[in-house]
UniProtKB/Swiss-Prot annotation:
Identification of the protein by name: Thymidylate synthase
UniProt organism field: Pseudomonas syringae pv. tomato (strain ATCC BAA-871 / DC3000)
Cross-referenced NCBIfam families: PRK13821.1, thym_sym
Enzyme class: transferase
Record-listed E.C. numbers: 2.1.1.45
Length: 323
């Protein structure tokens, strides 16, 4: 994981001190990239103990469309507690439904993106096409003398992605994201890791992932997001018959919080250990072995289905999360 430490050092050396919404200053640098070959190992940080089970619990929660901190806790992940219940801006938001509510965050958008179509009532062909695509009419109205209908359906972006990997692996449109502009004000926290693009290669039977993160806390967020992205790529590869390969990780605003400097400076004095290996439980079907496509495992997967083999690490360290 030398790449990670080199990025931290670069941001600390070349970044600029900036104020932000959290009240804790950051040293920030625009534009950064990491790239890992998952055939060489799993990108878990080794210069301190990684909260692997917590990160995997969060990923499983996203796959289930979880929107409540209590449900994340049941999956072994407590990182959403503060954003749900201590974020003053969210606490005063009329869209918040009560204790532990997080609103329309990541997994809701991934699995149940709210899609609407407004179609003139005279365009019968377009209405019939939309109905055939699973939309249903929810309203009829008129504006400026023109009558129209409104249709709605929830889109499962991840299911669409893995269906496309199976049916059209040459597509360059296999992606999902959580940046729903219409619902940003309905979220405890707008998505940071916001766009995932999958790249299956039918010739090599390898699959790669490009992830774009608009804003990344290098001390706490990056290790979590690397773990989740690599595990998600490995799971999707297993369910579709591809070997996980390249994980490319782009960051828009790469930053270090001032109160994380002691932890990160200490980590940079530690020698990284070799990368561990991700192991997925035998109970999770492998398309490459069975030839049977079982997308329902996106919901059936459990945090306990993932483990690290050969994970050596330096002692654990902690730092506060900015909310």
């Amino acid at each position: 994981m030398k790449q990670y430490l080199e990025l931290v050092a670069h941001v600390i050396k070349h970044g600029t001190l900036q104020a932000n919404r959290t009240g804790v200053n950051t040293i920030s640098f625009p534009g950064a990239m990491l790239r890992y070959d998952l055939q060489e190992g799993f990108p878990a940080i080794t210069t301190r103990r990684m909260a692997f089970k917590s990160a995997i619990g969060e990923m499983v929660g996203f796959l289930r469309g979880v929107s409540n901190a209590a449900e994340f806790r049941e999956l072994g992940c407590k990182v959403w507690d503060q954003n749900a219940n201590e974020n003053a801006q969210w606490l005063n938001n009329p869209f918040r439904k009560g204790e532990d509510d997080l609103g329309e965050i990541y997994g809701v958008q991934w699995r149940k993106w709210p899609a609407y179509k407004r179609i003139d009532t005279g365009n019968v062909a377009a209405i019939e096409l939309a109905l055939g695509q699973g939309y249903r009419q929810i309203a009829e109205s008129e504006e400026d003398g023109q009558s129209f209908v409104v249709l709605y359906k929830a889109i499962d972006q991840i299911r669409q992605c893995i269906d496309t990997i199976i049916n059209d692996p040459g597509s360059r449109r296999i992606l999902f994201h959580g940046w729903n502009c219409a619902q940003l004000d309905e979220m405890a926290l707008p998505p940071c890791h916001l766009l995932y693009q999958l790249h299956p290669n039918p010739q090599t039977r390898e699959i790669s992932l490009t992830l774009y993160i608009r804003s990344n806390d290098l001390g706490l967020g990056t290790p979590f997001n690397l773990t989740e992205g690599a595990a998600l790529l490995s799971l999707i590869g297993r369910l579709t018959g591809y070997t996980p390969r390249w994980f490319t990780y782009f960051i828009g605003d790469a930053h270090v919080y001032e109160n994380h400097l002691d932890m990160l400076n200490e980590q940079m004095t530690r020698e990284p250990y070799p990368m561990p290996k991700l192991v997925i439980s035998d109970r999770v079907p492998e398309f490459a072995k069975t030839g049977v496509y079982q997308p329902e495992w996106l919901e059936l997967i459990e945090p306990s289905d993932f483990s690290l083999e050969g994970y050596q690490h330096h002692p654990a360290m902690t730092a506060p999360m900015a909310v």
